[in-house]
């Protein structure tokens, strides 16, 4: 068995699966970039006094990331529930 299907000549690649995987990677990249921008803006001063994060900045970033993922998960569950209640034709 080869990694990523390399060397498998008998199996075709489904373009729809590739498109879905690319869309998922793009979505995760967007979430990560928004998370970094949001938490950096909230927790880190624009004037850097030290090369490393201070304890306060580190704690703030940790809490910010945690809250961001909690909110994202809650919103996803809410949207999924609404989608099940009101299916589109």
From Swiss-Prot:
A biological process from GO: protein insertion into mitochondrial inner membrane
Protein location: Mitochondrion inner membrane
The gene coding this protein: tim10
Annotated family: Belongs to the small Tim family.
Main location (coarse class): mitochondrion
Disulfide feature: 39-64, 43-60
GO MF annotations in UniProt: metal ion binding
Short motif Twin CX3C motif, span: 39-64
Protein name: Mitochondrial import inner membrane translocase subunit tim10
Alphabetical keyword list: Chaperone, Disulfide bond, Membrane, Metal-binding, Mitochondrion, Mitochondrion inner membrane, Protein transport, Translocation, Transport, Zinc
Classification via Pfam families: zf-Tim10_DDP
Domain remark text: The twin CX3C motif contains 4 conserved Cys residues that form 2 disulfide bonds in the mitochondrial intermembrane space. However, during the transit of TIM10 from cytoplasm into mitochondrion, the Cys residues probably coordinate zinc, thereby preventing folding and allowing its transfer across mitochondrial outer membrane.
Bilayer-crossing regions: none
Subunit structure: Heterohexamer; composed of 3 copies of TIM9 and 3 copies of TIM10, named soluble 70 kDa complex. Associates directly with the TIM22 complex, whose core is composed of TIM22 and TIM54. Interacts with the transmembrane regions of multi-pass transmembrane proteins in transit.
Membrane topology type: Peripheral membrane protein
Role according to the record: Mitochondrial intermembrane chaperone that participates in the import and insertion of multi-pass transmembrane proteins into the mitochondrial inner membrane. Also required for the transfer of beta-barrel precursors from the TOM complex to the sorting and assembly machinery (SAM complex) of the outer membrane. Acts as a chaperone-like protein that protects the hydrophobic precursors from aggregation and guide them through the mitochondrial intermembrane space.
Presence of the UniProt keyword Heme in the record: no
One GO location term (cellular component): mitochondrial intermembrane space protein transporter complex
Presence of the UniProt keyword Ribonucleoprotein in the record: no
């Amino acid at each position: 068995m080869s990694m990523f299907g390399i060397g498998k000549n008998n199996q075709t690649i489904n373009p729809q699966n590739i498109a879905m995987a690319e869309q998922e990677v793009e979505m995760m990249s967007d979430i990560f970039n928004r998370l970094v921008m949001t938490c950096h803006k909230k927790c880190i001063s624009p004037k850097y006094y030290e090369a490393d994060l201070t304890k306060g900045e580190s704690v703030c970033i940790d809490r910010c990331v945690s809250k961001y993922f909690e909110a994202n998960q809650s919103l996803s569950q809410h949207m999924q529930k609404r989608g099940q209640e009101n299916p589109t034709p």
